[in-house]
Amino acid sequence: MASIQFIQGVDEDIIPTVRLTRSRDGQTGTAVFRFVQPKLLQQQGEITGMYMIDEEGEIVTREVQAKFVNGQPQIIEALYVMKNAQAWERFMRFMNRYAEAKGLSFQRS
């Protein structure tokens, strides 16, 4: 089953919005994840990155930032950069598994 973790061993239950961009030649792309009031804000532990885990293994990004409202963390944003077509395809396989596990669908904008 596919999951996302910020603290290793603790699955994040909040479903993020995900914004994808891809270069015209299809070689590179980015995914921006936005979690509003994620569970990790109530957890104890060090956030060392965002871990996308499925049966193929683990995709990791260290580009994780918190957004604060009135001095309290409310939103976590993570950026994953795909530097080649293979990374894009691997990411899309993960996202398909994650969507299936969470009962979601892909929607083009």
Swiss-Prot record:
- Note the superkingdom of the native organism: Eukaryota
Q: What is its main location?
A: plastid
Q: Which InterPro entries does the entry mention?
A: Psb28_c1_sf (IPR038676), PSII_Psb28_class-1 (IPR005610)
Biological process annotations from GO: photosynthesis
Write out the entry's keywords from A to Z: Chloroplast, Membrane, Photosynthesis, Photosystem II, Plastid, Thylakoid
The keyword Plastid belongs to this UniProt entry's keyword annotation: yes
Q: How does it sit in the membrane?
A: Peripheral membrane protein
Where is the protein localized? Plastid, Chloroplast thylakoid membrane
Q: Which cellular component terms (GO) are annotated to the entry?
A: chloroplast thylakoid membrane; photosystem II
Signal sequence, start to end: none
Q: How does it assemble?
A: Part of the photosystem II complex.
* Similarity comment: Belongs to the Psb28 family.
Q: What is this protein called?
A: Photosystem II reaction center Psb28 protein
